[in-house]
């Protein structure tokens, strides 16, 4: 008998890199989308931390009145933010090399664009990485589909809305109070509370929280006990077991009698599909609503007040909401314009003496 020994060809450095990148045995899966995700998210995180701590004031309104957002310039964790790019930049791409100097780039809010652009690329890479990992494990792709909802929401407030409004200065500041300021101004300018897509988003988020709490409490209340009374019920289960952990029939029967029969699910797959679908679709609609309002397709405006036969105003909640919107609009960007256009366009009325009808 003759034994033939062949010399094993060593894989090239590129082949070994490809094998390592796509291996599902790594402690953290990287994948080809991870090659995009990791550097972009690291860049966004690093620049955000530096800018939040030490960035100089930014001329956000383009009127040579810089606004300080960093900790070293007098802010705290609540008031601090990375200030959006200047209105003088508009929606132009503004990398470091487009500025005459680093000081000019910082003064015009360049870090905001750098952070937002890298962050959006990074979270898109995260979606792709979730799909890629699921594909290599033979799983279905719904995890990545669900994550498109928060990515759509982030894209709406950081990219689509500024483009629609004509300037990245209208984007959401990267900070706690800056986020609240963005929400208030958005309400004043677009009446988002009266937009049906935002209302669907509220139903999605609050409904998803309710359904999650209901499902979790029903499951933990109907566990199938595999241990004695002297042992913890947790010892009766192991990860990946074939047997069911809880009794869905008991949970279904309880909930069906608590509310009514058809309010509960008797199919586990349908139940969990619904639990995933409800909040995701709600957030999709919210993101779509932000994108439509970016181009000034706003929420419902009931601008014509209800009046009686004598012409006197009958105050409704719509009147209160309109007044609140006008008040917020007067307060924001107070130095950028002398008076909001929708207040300056009508005839001057003695507001302190009468309650005028709000006419759009």
UniProtKB/Swiss-Prot annotation:
The record marks 190 as: Stabilizes free radical intermediate. The chain crosses the membrane at residues 29-46, 118-133, 142-156, 197-218, 274-288. Pheophytin a binds at residue 126. GO terms for biological process: photosynthetic electron transport in photosystem II; response to herbicide. Photosystem II (PSII) is a light-driven water:plastoquinone oxidoreductase that uses light energy to abstract electrons from H(2)O, generating O(2) and a proton gradient subsequently used for ATP formation. It consists of a core antenna complex that captures photons, and an electron transfer chain that converts photonic excitation into a charge separation. The D1/D2 (PsbA/PsbD) reaction center heterodimer binds P680, the primary electron donor of PSII as well as several subsequent electron acceptors. Belongs to the reaction center PufL/M/PsbA/D family. This is Photosystem II protein D1. It comes from Guillardia theta (Cryptophyte).
């Amino acid at each position: 008998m003759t034994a033939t020994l062949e010399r094993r060809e060593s894989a090239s450095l590129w082949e070994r890199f490809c094998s390592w990148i796509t291996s599902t045995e790594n402690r953290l899966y990287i994948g080809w989308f991870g090659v995009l995700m990791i550097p972009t998210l690291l860049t966004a995180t690093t620049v955000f931390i530096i800018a939040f701590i030490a960035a100089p004031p930014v001329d956000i309104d383009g009127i040579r009145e810089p606004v300080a957002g960093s900790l070293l310039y007098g802010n705290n964790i609540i008031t601090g933010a990375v200030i959006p790019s200047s209105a003088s930049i508009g929606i132009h791409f503004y990398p470091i090399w487009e500025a005459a100097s680093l000081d000019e780039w910082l003064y015009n809010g360049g870090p905001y664009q750098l952070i937002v652009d890298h962050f959006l690329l990074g979270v898109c890479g995260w979606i792709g990485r979730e799909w890629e990992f699921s594909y290599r494990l033979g799983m279905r792709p719904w995890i990545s589909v669900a994550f498109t909802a928060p990515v759509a929401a982030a894209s709406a407030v950081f990219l689509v809305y500024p483009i629609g409004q004509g300037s990245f200065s209208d984007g959401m500041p990267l900070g706690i109070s800056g986020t609240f300021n963005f929400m208030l101004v958005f309400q004043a300018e677009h009446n988002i509370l009266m937009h049906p897509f935002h209302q669907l988003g509220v139903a999605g988020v609050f409904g998803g929280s309710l359904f999650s709490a209901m499902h979790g409490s029903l499951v933990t209340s109907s566990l199938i006990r595999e241990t004695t009374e002297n042992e913890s019920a947790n010892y009766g289960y192991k990860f990946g077991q074939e047997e069911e952990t809880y009794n869905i029939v008991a949970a279904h029967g309880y909930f069906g009698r608590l509310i009514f029969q058809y309010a509960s699910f008797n199919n586990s797959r349908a139940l969990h599909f619904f639990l995933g679908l409800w909040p995701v679709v709600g957030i999709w609609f919210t993101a779509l609503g932000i994108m439509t309002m970016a181009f000034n397709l706003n929420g419902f405006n009931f601008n014509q007040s209800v009046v009686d036969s004598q012409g006197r105003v009958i105050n409704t909640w719509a009147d209160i909401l309109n007044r609140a919107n006008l008040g917020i609009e007067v307060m924001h960007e107070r130095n950028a314009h002398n008076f909001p256009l929708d207040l300056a366009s009508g005839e001057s009325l003695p507001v302190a003496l009468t309650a005028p009808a709000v006419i759009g």
